[in-house]
Amino acid sequence: MTVYGFHASHEQVPPADLLAAAVRAEEAGFGAAMCSDHFSPWSVRQGESGFAWSWLGAALQATDRIPFGVVNAPGQRYHPAIVAQAVGTLASMYPDRFWAALGSGEASNEHITGDRWPRKDVRNARLRECVDVIRALLRGEEVSHDGLVTVDRARLWSLPDTVPPLIGAACSEATAAWCADWADGLITVNAPHERLRRIVDAYRSAGGSGPLRLQVHLSWDPDPDTALAVAHDQWRTNVHGPPASWDLDTAELFDGVSEHVTPERVAEAVNVSADLGQHAAWLQEYADLGFDAVMLHHVGREQSAFIDAFGAEVLPRLDATPAGPARAEEAR
């Protein structure tokens, strides 16, 4: 069966409100939660970007049982040893309730260091070095490394009992296949079914193991016009695929290139409907593709009505299961 979780969008919701939403989601029956670690939003209209790591500590403490995950990009804005320390601390305090998905990053978050923004192949190579450093540190090893990142005699003094899962984040077949060599699972975002099948097949065919997670962007309101208007206002900057989504470096630039994006174009990237039955059907289709967890992101800034409606009317229609413990299958 599939876990249906809540995506906490730091780019759109103030941290205290987002914390209350995560608690509300658990109470409503969502089986998991996740967020992305961003320094800036995708649009000035979104208007927020709280610090994921401090929020995660509060969210794990405020909830009782659901696991949380974070999508993070080590290597530029974060030294991998700092990411390892953050992951290890949360996993130590909240065993079996935390996982981290690691990706190569986006310029909109990473440019703040003032360092050059590398090519995608270089970012992937840097990410792989970071993964190896993070995993070794979480196993209790002392690490020195000299490559695209430099580590000098780093050691974690506070360790979790078990190494939490390090998940690969991928939006393309090539990246999914590349992740298979090191990841404890895969997370991607909603796309046409055939493309999702290819991404999953690329990961599994390359030997990838562990659970498959899918983040689904959706917009719901009892009024269909409002549902579409909210999606267009909040998420039209997010219809652009790579390399634009990787390389644009400010919210203002995203707004500029999205000025003429139509509501109809947004509806190709966001599941928009006033019909809760339609949303349930869409989500079941994703589960039928083989995803073990489907993380729901309502793209509006107001989350309460969405959480309540989906908890009461959508989740009961789905073949859902509570999330199991967040554990890596084996040491790599």
Please describe what each predicted stretch is:
Residues 1-332:
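Active-site-adjacent structural elements that line small-molecule/cofactor binding pockets in enzymes
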